């Protein structure tokens, strides 16, 4: 019976969309956002009809597994009416000793990122953070903020000018664990 328990548990987790990496105890918190709460105007985009502060939230994480050689952070809106979601922010090659990013780190001009970290182009076409700005009248969108523990120092296919979707694809092969915090925003 014990021989069947592990394969059955793995199968059930796969059906639920979970993985062993998700179950390793990694956590993500923010002083600027609680799980399931509305994102503040401070983080909302300043453009495309939105008038926010466009500041990336402060993020802190813990519980990275042994073998973590770098981190990546993303903010993704799966509710965007594009058919494939919308990438608001992707940062990769964050050094392994890093456990937080300060508020506003997504502004490439401020140079608040740890040395070696790369901010890719978001789906607005700019490098760094682009805050929430869903179409007016849409139901609130879910903004998934995820930190990834990565098994390589530098993602092999992602370069300085990499599109966010390419970085995401590269992360699929190199993620040891991840943690997600979801915020909501609508207008």
Regions flagged by a language model, labelled:
Residues 1-5:
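Positively charged n-region of N-terminal signal peptides that target proteins for export
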């Amino acid at each position: 019976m014990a021989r069947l328990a592990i394969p059955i548990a793995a199968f059930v987790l796969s059906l639920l969309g979970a993985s062993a990496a998700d179950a390793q105890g990694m956590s993500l918190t923010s002083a600027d956002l609680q799980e399931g709460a509305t994102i503040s105007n401070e983080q909302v985009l300043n453009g495309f009809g939105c008038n926010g502060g466009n500041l990336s939230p402060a993020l802190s994480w813990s519980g990275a597994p042994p073998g973590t050689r770098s981190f990546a952070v993303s903010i993704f809106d799966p509710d965007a009416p594009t058919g494939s979601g919308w990438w608001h922010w992707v940062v990769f090659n964050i050094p392994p000793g890093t456990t937080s990013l300060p508020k506003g780190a997504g502004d490439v001009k401020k140079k608040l990122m740890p040395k070696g970290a790369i901010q890719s182009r978001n789906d607005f076409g700019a490098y760094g953070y682009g805050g929430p700005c869903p179409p007016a009248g849409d139901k609130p969108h879910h903004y998934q903020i995820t930190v990834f523990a990565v098994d390589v120092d530098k993602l092999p296919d992602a370069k300085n000018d990499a599109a966010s979707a390419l970085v995401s694809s590269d992360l699929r092969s190199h993620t040891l664990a991840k943690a997600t915090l979801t915020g909501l925003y609508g207008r």
